[in-house]
Amino acid sequence: MAKSARTKTARPATRTETDSFGPIEVPSDRYWGAQTERSRQNFRIGTDRMPISLVHALGIVKLAAAQSNRELGLLDQRRASAIIRAAREVIDGSLDDHFPLVVWQTGSGTQTNMNLNEVIANRANELLGGELGAKKPVHPNDHVNMSQSSNDSFPTAMHIAAASRITADLVPALGELLRALRKKEKEFAKIVKIGRTHTQDATPLTLGQEFSGYAAQVESGIARLKVAVKELYPLAQGGTAVGTGLNAKPRFARLFAKHVAGITKLPFTSAANKFEALASNDAYVLAHGAISSVATGLFKIANDIRLLGSGPRSGLGELILPENEPGSSIMPGKVNPTQCEAMTMVCCQVFGNHTAITVAGSQGHFELNVYKPVLAYNMLHSIRLMADAARSFTEHCVSGIRADEKRISELMQRSLMLVTALAPKIGYDNAAKVAKTAHANGTTLKEEALRLGFVTADEFDRLVQPEKMTKPG
């Protein structure tokens, strides 16, 4: 009896949803509908899900659209309130499990847009006491997608997601790295070391000056991101299918952008030309270019730090890097610059993502670019990777870097390029002769300068002072 009772009350595994192709069975514990299920079955390609930050951004699109349509008198209060509540649940992540689609689908993102429409409609109907799959009182197309097309909604969400994540994640993470580098700049301000150009010895500088260069690179990268993100503020919404605005009221686009700005606290606007906003993704390519330029700088910084920390006994050994974990399965006691390696691998991935974005961005055939999912995926992938890598690099590497002052001094005193300080006194050719002779004989610069009769001991000591060589003059 008990078993029979449980069988009667158990929820069926599936329910029937319909679209223009007819009925299809959908998991009963999920809010998505027929079009999402067809995409799920037709595009079993890889495991790369549509980024959840893009899904949340589409939730913002649906929320702002419902608010705008309500204000325009197109959507009644009852339906609007239910859609708005369901959209907020999408935005806050409560419904993340209901967005199963992969990146590799229609190039307009239509199936993901319909995934949002179906989930929000079913959830709204549930809130209103309706049945899942009934499409009433809230219809996924007629109400949730009102005044919209996938062709303007998806690129709008792309801009919202990228601008939001750059602002909230990447820029703050780089700010943490910048502060750590500035701290090291001050800490190392009085440590004089030999400089290197072409990987060969050059004139001295302070370790603080070297780190000031790294800090300036990060600071400039942040500044470029803040400029580039402005390119993402104009939104395609209101262009509908091809940019004409068919089926959207003339006031809709500006009203929508105002609501998005209010929701995100970012200055989004309505794009001046909707044809460009649908057919091209030039702003996306530019914005990712700024991210790629940051990766270029971080690759250089991480590479320098791991080389300066090479050793511990047979490398440059000027820096002592934090020891976070064992480095070898065969060599006992070995510790590797793993944070530098992770950072440079992330940078390589970002460079690859930029190539994909550049190629995809060039594919705006006629009135619509149909490579939008791969554009969004690579952009958001880069932002996430760069932000995470910057935080990891800061916490587990940069903040714990120490200088081996004894090793730094030893290498500096052995450098032949200190001879540069003699050039104004004895001339370039004679200074070069001192350096070459000292190198050939295995002697010091001072010994050869005195032997050749170019300067006295007092003159050499007065002219060759590494700490004075770190400043103009």
Curated annotation (Swiss-Prot):
Any one biological process term the GO annotation gives? malate metabolic process
* Region entry Disordered, spans: 1-28
Fill in the subunit field for this protein: Homotetramer.
Q: What is this protein called?
A: Fumarate hydratase class II 2
Q: Write the Enzyme Commission number(s) for this entry.
A: 4.2.1.2
- Tell me yes or no: is Signal among this UniProt entry's keywords: no
Top EC group: lyase
According to its record, what are the GO cellular component terms?
cytoplasm
Q: Which InterPro entries match?
A: Fum_hydII (IPR005677), Fumarase/histidase_N (IPR024083), Fumarase_C_C (IPR018951), Fumarate_lyase_CS (IPR020557), Fumarate_lyase_fam (IPR000362), Fumarate_lyase_N (IPR022761), L-Aspartase-like (IPR008948)
UniProt superkingdom:
Bacteria
Active site positions:
H198, S328
Q: A Gene Ontology molecular-function term?
A: fumarate hydratase activity
The organism is Bradyrhizobium diazoefficiens (strain JCM 10833 / BCRC 13528 / IAM 13628 / NBRC 14792 / USDA 110)
